[in-house]
């Protein structure tokens, strides 16, 4: 599966601590093999139809959706208390 990151995602990603960036890269590799792997704690966001989250740490999440080609589009990353407000 192909993953794409939006400009907004990349902008927020650059602001994250190095340790969170490395953990996301690890999670992304798992995601590409199986987006429903239990280590990702993938959840559907009820308030945002078609949007899902994966857990990076207990506090950090990344949001994504699937485009018409089946590619995963990551559009937000950040602290769990702030990310859903975007």
Where are the language model's segments positioned?
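A short, surface-exposed loop/turn module that caps and links secondary-structure elements
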Residues: 30-54
